[in-house]
Amino acid sequence: MIIKDYSEAKKIFLHYNGSYFHMQREEYLEQYMKFNISKKEERKWLKEKVEKILSTISEVKNINLKYDKYWNILYILTETLEDNHLLDKTISAFEKDLKYLDIFSINMILEMIHDNKKIWKNFKKKLKKIIQNNDISKNEIISKEQNKLKGTQFLTEDKVIKKYREILSKLQS
């Protein structure tokens, strides 16, 4: 079935960041597949979404919202799209935001990149240089915004620092 108005398909696809798994889990995959969208069109939509988020990320002041935007972008770029140009732009934006993010968020972003071995290999040197060139010693360890989230109440500053040191050692190796 080919439908000329793809707005519903695009809405579903982007809501799940292109993840068929998540569409299936919430019972939207069958509905989405009826639109018969090409992979090329899906890639275009994902690139547009990443570009849109990147264009506004510097305006976001709330640490939790900023982290969510990075998580959203990195999920797309590490799980679905793997676009090195957009990943490079994302890492450059991340570098500018380092002074605003808490160490918990920085660590989570680095771990997300680390989980994709191919991307980690391609961007490890750049990430290492970024971390070395930025003093984050004055950054909060766990921001007030992050501390309000479910699940973070069990985190201690010591645990966050320990995890951050672990990811730093992976950058060094």
Where are these regions (language model features)?
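Charged, low-complexity interaction regions
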Residues: 20-21, 62-64, 100, 136-142, ...
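HEAT/HEAT-like alpha-solenoid repeats
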Residues: 14-18, 55-62, 91-99, 132
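Positions within ordered alpha-helical repeat solenoids
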Residues: 15-18, 75-79, 96, 111-115, ...
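Eukaryotic acidic, Ser/Thr-rich intrinsically disordered low-complexity regions
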Residues: 139-169, 173
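Amphipathic alpha-helical elements of HEAT/ARM-like alpha-solenoid repeat scaffolds that form extended
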Residues: 12, 22-37, 66-80, 102-116, ...
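Amphipathic alpha-helical segments within extended alpha-helical solenoids and repeat-rich scaffolds
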Residues: 49-53, 102, 130-139
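N-terminal "cap/leader" segments of large eukaryotic alpha-helical scaffolds
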Residues: 2-18
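Alpha-helix capping and inter-helical loop/turn segments
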Residues: 3-4, 33-48, 54, 76-89, ...
